[in-house]
Amino acid sequence: DPNPSQSIDEWTCGAFDCIAEAIDTEEMEVFHYHKSIIDTNYKLWHDTNSEFYHDFMHYHNRVTGFNDAYFARKNIPFDNGHVNVSSFTVQYEEYEGFEDRGELSFPNLPPNQWYMVDLFPGFNFNLRGSAYRSDSVTPLGPNKVLIEFRGYGLKKDTPEERATRIEHHNSI
């Protein structure tokens, strides 16, 4: 639409407020991009990735995150179909070979916090302390979707910080 009736902030209706200070403070850059065409329908992909039962499919999530705070999370709905999930502290050190990731958290983000924002109709943003990822899904047909995954780091990252951020991103 060349003449949108809403700004981005109006359209997102506050769904990004939970991570705004972490992602707006420093300039970011993409360090990872992957796309894939999946033989599934859009609704199935969206629902599978936005429901809480999704976490049960990931061994890593079951080991590092299933604590009282995890189960107290809430899906917080916003106008225009957007949702964010309240945060909890991920216990990375509970996963064999992992360690605490709090030292490299995004700006203004408490150590090892995890947030997820779903923007309807097809965008997902995950901020896991040191690693920020966005996924977009585009329907290509009734049973085919294009998924694009991006990983972000802070532009000011040192080479060592960037390597750690990439390792954290790739491990989830």
Predicted regions and their residues:
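C-terminal catalytic domain of Rieske-type non-heme iron oxygenases
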Residues: D1-I172
